[in-house]
Amino acid sequence: MNWVPSMRKLSDELLIESYFKATEMNLNRDFIELIENEIKRRSLGHIISVSS
């Protein structure tokens, strides 16, 4: 998928904001998991309590 690497261009703040907005809007679970994976990759899971 071409757009997944684009998540790396998002700031940490925008990535976290996107996660909360996506969950609030009940967006597609696969999309939310992509965001969660990027959050974990950046070691930011503690901010949103993403389980490993």
UniProtKB/Swiss-Prot annotation:
Forms a stable heterotetramer with KinA (comprising two molecules of each protein), by binding to the KinA dimerization/phosphotransfer domain. Keywords: Protein kinase inhibitor, Sporulation. It comes from the Bacteria. Mediates a developmental checkpoint inhibiting initiation of sporulation (by preventing phosphorylation of spo0A) in response to defects in the replication initiation machinery. Inhibits autophosphorylation of the histidine protein kinase KinA, forming a molecular barricade that prevents productive interaction between the ATP-binding site in the catalytic domain and the phosphorylatable His in the phosphotransfer domain of KinA. Probably also inhibits the activity of KinB, but has relatively little effect on KinC. This is Sporulation inhibitor sda. The lineage of its organism: Bacteria, Bacillati, Bacillota, Bacilli, Bacillales. GO terms for biological process: sporulation resulting in formation of a cellular spore. The record marks M25, L27, F31 as: Important for interaction with KinA. The keyword Membrane does not apply. Changing L34A: Partial loss of ability to inhibit KinA autophosphorylation. One of its GO terms (molecular function) is protein kinase inhibitor activity. SUPFAM superfamilies: Sporulation inhibitor Sda (SSF100985). The keyword Repressor does not apply. InterPro entries: Sda (IPR015064), Sda_sf (IPR036916).
